[in-house]
């Protein structure tokens, strides 16, 4: 058997998350079904599991296929079976593990105050976010290594809630005619819905609905003020570092 590394992008609006679902509407279901159609029976491992509605620009996968498959041939037959909501960007032979070998993961969150067309609603979150300076002040609180037990949704399977965030900042840019604030958060790994809870905390601070002290209390597992993640549609798994 040969191990393959695949880099994919997908539209999270069409799936119930990355992980396999009973109704077969997970991204993993789509990929494994496409591989099965080619006679390849393999569990597909992803660098990170995204929730329902969350997108990926460069999700990385690892899986095994029979030795008669090479990267060029498999790409040719697999890519059309994944389109249009999953795009196979790159495929190469590589002996590695997509999740365990990943060193860093980068997420981006897109937020605009005024969405001018409904056609972008699944891809850019809409809502007030206050000031850019306040957002960056809040984001700085999260850098470093912390126990993120109070920044995760229930159901995330993990025995170690400690994670390191290497960089977290926000900036403004224009995306398809919309002024957006983009949150960029890079860490070694993330707990379930952790990024969305972090962004929500920063937005609520910027809107003067919570204080920095409340954010710090939640980071240190003293008291949880933010319990509901910000909407999923603005979040993208942007890059995985190896």
Curated annotation (Swiss-Prot):
Q: What class of enzyme is it?
A: isomerase
| Positions with a binding annotation for substrate | 107
Q: Which residues form the signal peptide?
A: none
> Which Enzyme Commission numbers does its entry carry?
5.4.99.12
Question: Which keywords fit this entry according to its UniProt record?
Answer: Isomerase, tRNA processing
- What molecular function terms (GO) are annotated for this protein? RNA binding; tRNA pseudouridine(38-40) synthase activity
State the reactions this protein catalyses.
uridine(38/39/40) in tRNA = pseudouridine(38/39/40) in tRNA
Q: Which residues form a coiled coil?
A: none
Q: Which residues participate directly in catalysis? A: 51
Q: Which GO terms describe its biological process?
A: tRNA pseudouridine synthesis
Keyword Metal-binding annotated: no
Known function: Formation of pseudouridine at positions 38, 39 and 40 in the anticodon stem and loop of transfer RNAs.
Subunit details: Homodimer.
- Protein family per UniProt: Belongs to the tRNA pseudouridine synthase TruA family.
Q: What is this protein called?
A: tRNA pseudouridine synthase A
- This chain's source organism reads Helicobacter pylori (strain Shi470)
